[in-house]
């Protein structure tokens, strides 16, 4: 920690022996050892607290990134939902219009047709008139909508 060599420690020990004396030196050395131990524990506690705070800070940053990603995904999903809803409403309106037109066409076909006036030809001067045949009734095969395939 302090980069002190063995010879420097020996010099400090000899000076302490001369200054403090041989009777009090063991007690002072024990007290200094306890103080150094407490200082090391305190430094280690501070280091571990700093590590925990750094890890918590990293976790908070990660959580914030995940929250931001979740918000962007929700926004994207809402936009997609709105787009799909608009498309569905447009298709539903178009389908309703088509159904209404088809209903009108069916109701118009069910109405009794007025007889067409007889057309006289130059070759036929008789009272014989040609009748106009009504359109043939639709068969079940004709009622199926076209699928776009030639099968």
Swiss-Prot record:
GO MF, one example: protein transmembrane transporter activity
Subunit text: The Tat system comprises two distinct complexes: a TatABC complex, containing multiple copies of TatA, TatB and TatC subunits, and a separate TatA complex, containing only TatA subunits. Substrates initially bind to the TatABC complex, which probably triggers association of the separate TatA complex to form the active translocon.
Keyword Metal-binding: no
Annotated segments matching region Disordered: 66-151
PANTHER family: SEC-INDEPENDENT PROTEIN TRANSLOCASE PROTEIN TATA, CHLOROPLASTIC
Entry annotated with the keyword Zinc-finger: no
Family affiliation: Belongs to the TatB family.
Keywords: Cell inner membrane, Cell membrane, Membrane, Protein transport, Translocation, Transmembrane, Transmembrane helix, Transport
Gene Ontology cellular component annotations, sorted alphabetically: TAT protein transport complex
Name assigned to this protein: Sec-independent protein translocase protein TatB
Pfam families recorded: TatA_B_E
Organism: Bordetella parapertussis (strain 12822 / ATCC BAA-587 / NCTC 13253)
Single GO BP term: protein transport by the Tat complex
Location of this chain's protein in the cell: Cell inner membrane
Start-end of Basic and acidic residues biased regions: 93-103
TM spans (from-to): 1-21
Membrane topology, as annotated: Single-pass membrane protein
Task performed by this protein: Part of the twin-arginine translocation (Tat) system that transports large folded proteins containing a characteristic twin-arginine motif in their signal peptide across membranes. Together with TatC, TatB is part of a receptor directly interacting with Tat signal peptides. TatB may form an oligomeric binding site that transiently accommodates folded Tat precursor proteins before their translocation.
Main location: membrane
Biased composition range(s): Low complexity: 109-122, 133-151
């Amino acid at each position: 920690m302090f980069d002190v060599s063995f010879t420097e420690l020996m010099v400090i020990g000899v000076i302490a022996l001369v200054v403090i004396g041989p009777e009090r030196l063991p007690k002072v050395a024990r007290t200094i050892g306890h103080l150094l131990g407490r200082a090391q524990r305190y430094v280690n506690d501070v280091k571990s607290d700093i590590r925990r705070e750094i890890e918590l800070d990293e976790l908070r940053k990660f959580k914030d990134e995940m929250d931001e990603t979740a918000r962007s995904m929700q926004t994207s999903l809402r936009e997609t939902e709105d787009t799909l809803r608009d498309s569905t409403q447009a298709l539903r309106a178009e389908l309703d219009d088509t159904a209404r037109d088809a209903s009108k066409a069916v109701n118009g076909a069910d109405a009794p047709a007025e007889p067409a006036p007889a057309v006289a030809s130059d070759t036929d001067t008789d009272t014989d008139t040609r009748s106009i045949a009504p359109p043939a009734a639709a068969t079940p095969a004709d009622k199926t909508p076209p699928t776009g395939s030639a099968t």
